[in-house]
Amino acid sequence: MAAITASMVAELRAKTDAPMMECKKALTEADGDMARAEELLRVKLGNKASKAASRVTAEGVVASFIGGNAGSLVELNCETDFVSKNDDFLAFSKKVAELVATQNPADVAALSALPLDGSTVDAVRLALVGKIGENLSIRRFVRFDTANKLAAYLHGTRIGVLVEYTGADEQVGKDVAMHIAAMKPVSLSSEDVPAELIAKERSIAEQKAAESGKPAEIVAKMVDGSVQKYLKEVSLLNQTFVKNDKQTIEQMLKAGNASVQKFALFVVGEGIEKKQDDFAAEVAAQVAAAKQQ
């Protein structure tokens, strides 16, 4: 008889969303064969054994770590806002952020395989999934390794910023990071704004200008003006400093003989389509399922 470990139970729980005791029973019956145990649960529990891994993880936290010449920003996701405040989940996110900074993994897969607490990052994640009962995932991370200065700012646990800068004191770095969290620039300078964003903004400006009924040359100037305004609004150096509306970020940095090399901004769930529950459809599906039994 194969020994059934807690990590095996947690892994099966993560795959099937079945109760812990049912997972242990299935593993015992399958003599430790994970695939066989999963099959047994599917037969026994039917639709109740839905995969936690198929559920959308649009909530979560952003964590950061700076040590030596390296700094990191990590986004970890969960299913509900409630779990995003769970102490175990928050502690795990901090450990992951530190690993990114100190171990320099190539990607999320490499990060997941790193040693953590006598196991691996992914095994610890799976154990948390089993304990908490929600799908948890490491979505993305960024790492800066530099001889320059680093600053990080977390707005609660949902917005995180990492900044590389030179020539300024620590407070300036923190101020810039806080500004980025508040104003959410998409690039450092107007020259760095992605071409697809500029094209989208130009298209919108052209549609609006065309409705004015003005001559083509005037319309062209209106479009160019709108695009230039957009570029200033979304580029960090051109934005008005949130703590002093009399100067831009670029002016503030020059006054302190400082400069920003790059930054990263993470907002939890950005770009993830969150599932919206349809209660009526859910009830209808349950009724239909009951009729088939």
Swiss-Prot record:
Q: Which PROSITE patterns match?
A: EF_TS_2 (PS01127)
- Keyword rRNA-binding part of the UniProt annotation: no
Q: Give the top-rank taxon of the lineage listed in the UniProt record for this protein.
A: Bacteria
- Tell me any Pfam family this protein matches: EF_TS
* Protein name, per record: Elongation factor Ts
Region annotation (Involved in Mg(2+) ion dislocation from EF-Tu) maps to: 80-83
Could you list the residue ranges forming a coiled coil in this record?
none
- Which family does the record assign? Belongs to the EF-Ts family.
CDD domains annotated for this entry?
UBA_EF-Ts (cd14275)
A GO CC term attached to the entry:
cytoplasm
Q: Name one GO molecular function term.
A: translation elongation factor activity
Compartment(s) of residence: Cytoplasm
For this UniProt record, the keywords arranged alphabetically read as follows: Cytoplasm, Elongation factor, Protein biosynthesis
Job description of the protein: Associates with the EF-Tu.GDP complex and induces the exchange of GDP to GTP. It remains bound to the aminoacyl-tRNA.EF-Tu.GTP complex up to the GTP hydrolysis stage on the ribosome.
